[in-house]
Amino acid sequence: MLDIAYIRQNPDEVAAMLRHRQLASEEPKLQQLLECDRQRKELVQRSDEQKALRNKVSKEVAEIKKKGVGSPDELISQMKAVSDAITAMDSRLSELEAEMENLLLALPNKLHPSVPIGRSAEDNMVFGEPVHFEHSLNFPLKNHLELGKALRILDFERGAKVSGAGFPVYVGKGARLERALINFMLDMHTEQHGYTEVFPPFLVNQESLRGTGQWPKFADQVYYIGEDDLYAIPTAEVPLTNLHRGEMVETNALPISYTAYTACFRREAGSYGKDTRGFLRVHQFNKVEMVKFTRPEDSYTALEEIRHHAQAILEALKIPYRVLLLCSGDISANATKCYDIEVWSPAEEKYLEASSCSNFEEYQARRSNIRFKPDSKSKPEFVHTLNGSGLATSRLMVSLLEHYQTADGHIRVPNVLQRYTGFTEI
């Protein structure tokens, strides 16, 4: 959530941000917010004046009663009228503040100056050079669906029977390989990258979704359990960030770095017509997440660290990939800057998103009220929060199976995973 003071002082800058994000249609809401803010300031001033008058009259009534000279009735009547006016103003003030809160929650984050201006994903910039690894694939390739079915390690049909489309089943060595990927990534992040492992809840309350920005904007993307008023997490970013919701974080504890494995659940509303085969679009998938809380001045250095940590996983697995710097029209509403890391699918002959690494600056911290004091004499400030997929296993599994397939239809297990699987080939 943006600071209303920043919006008030920089309305043209916020309007330009909306246009850069291809959200020019939201500008009337910005004007509505500014008008609510103007009315609120006027109302607060009038209410304060009336409260001062009420206090003055109240003292005069007390003085008359104390001296026993004259009648306070006229002043009491005046005080009642003032009190009624204050009640009405306070009621309207509550309405204005609620309206402002809703408008602020819906407003996207500002953009970092380095974010390229563009309309859609076609305008994203390739960051650096694509990274290649040599794999001997000089034979007719099978895609991940064909490999999974032939080797009986993936079963999408039975997953659909149990839960519906988009719920994969890993079987035998496929399940072992998935678990190996998760354990390898967690070990790398905790042992080499300095993260603390967390195993969080997979169900969260609405306040948690609100804190990280998934609510209310993406309410149609999450699974809701009505009887208990809980939501299945779309990403571990939600519970990890909300661990410190409403807290004053110890300054010497910053930066805080968490990593977690969770299953993730997404309805993917509006995905009709998109490629939904196999792992390309699923409702449940596994992901290892990285989340950081930093001082404001350190957050962009931390973003580069998170990106490097995600890339390190792919380099250890020898999976070809590229990094994209997302443009203003494709970046998420919550992020000020975001990198996507895409893995290459040799069978599909295209890149597939496997990780997003984002800086939210104080956007989530303001919504979640996560603060710190730079020093004992300073006022509290909001921390900056960041997150990165480190990584989602579904698209990663596509690339891994296709790159490590052999001419006779088997799968070689990457060297770094063999100590986790206990076998070298599927």
UniProtKB/Swiss-Prot annotation:
This is Serine--tRNA ligase. Pfam families: Seryl_tRNA_N, tRNA-synt_2b. L-serine binds at residues 235-237, 289, 389. It catalyses: tRNA(Ser) + L-serine + ATP = L-seryl-tRNA(Ser) + AMP + diphosphate + H(+); tRNA(Sec) + L-serine + ATP = L-seryl-tRNA(Sec) + AMP + diphosphate + H(+). HAMAP family: Ser_tRNA_synth_type1. GO terms for cellular component: cytoplasm. One of its GO terms (biological process) is seryl-tRNA aminoacylation. ATP binds at residues 266-268, 282, 353-356. Pathway: Aminoacyl-tRNA biosynthesis; selenocysteinyl-tRNA(Sec) biosynthesis; L-seryl-tRNA(Sec) from L-serine and tRNA(Sec): step 1/1. Homodimer. The tRNA molecule binds across the dimer. It comes from the Bacteria. The gene is serS. Coiled coil: none annotated. Keywords: Aminoacyl-tRNA synthetase, ATP-binding, Cytoplasm, Ligase, Nucleotide-binding, Protein biosynthesis.
